[in-house]
Amino acid sequence: MVRIVIALGGNALLRNGEPRNYEVQYSHAIETFKIIRDITEKNETVITHGNGPQVGDIQQSHEISGIMANLHQSVAMSQGYIGEILANAYDEVRSKYSLSKSIFTIITRSVVNRNDPAFASPEKPIGRYYSDQEVDEAKRNGWVMKKFKDGWRRVVPSPEPIEILEEKAIEELVREGHIPLAVGGGGIPVVKENGRIVGIDAVIDKDIASSLLAAQLKADYFMILTDVESVYVNFGKPDQKPLGRIHLNEIEKYYAEGQFADGSMKPKVRAAINFVKNGGKAAFITNLENGSAALSGKAGTVIVP
């Protein structure tokens, strides 16, 4: 039995163009846990997840109501919202397949540095697209807006996490044979100030935070489940090539060359690199359907020391 941290991608709950209601997300969560049940049952497993669409929806709901919530509060709300979906879905799969482990949703805080350069240059998009006619009103909320191909989106700081506060509770649960569901949306961003823990407006990259948690837990493996089977070099070009098993120094070279796109594969590769550099045995990047095959070395990208 090994210890593994699995970071679920957005497609574990939603697909592009689908309605974002409870029923759709619950249905996808059921399928997710069916697919990964052999991994969770046979290994010490921690599951993390993103919250990009959901935290944007929460912020939009507050925008419509006229009662604005701080961004760190919205991240906390998304952890409860998504945690309920995933926990209920797991318990249904557990009952159907007579699985032995219980799942626990952990409201998780990630400590960041108030002086992180990310606060001076917000870059992480959240929420819906805004038209040229709507953008001025959005800016009146104090939001930083950025023009993308399909319209304007709000962008927020995405600082580097430096500590996962609930790590000891997560460690205890996984050691006792349970499945902690943690670091939702990268964790609630907080800073330590004068003996207090204070929320700060940001959204932390969930893969980077999951990698940090995996290192803190001394996990053997770290797996990022996304919507593609492998990491590619020269992606989208005639000579694009999937990466299979690759050593740390090789993928660091590709990373330095700028082979991986900002906001999509780049943070995933960086998270995997961080984990292996911090003592992990291997990091995997693949799609949901190939998670088990990747662990056996038969699919996906596997980064080793």
Swiss-Prot record:
EC number: 2.7.2.2
CDD domains hit by this protein: AAK_CK (cd04235)
Main location (coarse class): cytoplasm
Cysteines joined through disulfide linkages: none
GO cellular component, one term: cytosol
Record Pfam families: AA_kinase
Location of this chain's protein in the cell: Cytoplasm
GO biological process: arginine deiminase pathway
Family: Belongs to the carbamate kinase family.
InterPro entries linked: AceGlu_kinase-like_sf, Asp/Glu/Uridylate_kinase, Carb_kinase
EC top class, as a word: transferase
Gene: arcC
Protein name: Carbamate kinase
Leader sequence segment: none
Source lineage: Archaea, Methanobacteriati, Thermoplasmatota, Thermoplasmata, Thermoplasmatales
Pathway where this protein functions: Metabolic intermediate metabolism; carbamoyl phosphate degradation; CO(2) and NH(3) from carbamoyl phosphate: step 1/1
Alphabetic keyword roster: Arginine metabolism, ATP-binding, Cytoplasm, Kinase, Nucleotide-binding, Transferase
Catalysed transformations (reactions): hydrogencarbonate + NH4(+) + ATP = carbamoyl phosphate + ADP + H2O + H(+)
Alphabetized GO MF terms: ATP binding; carbamate kinase activity
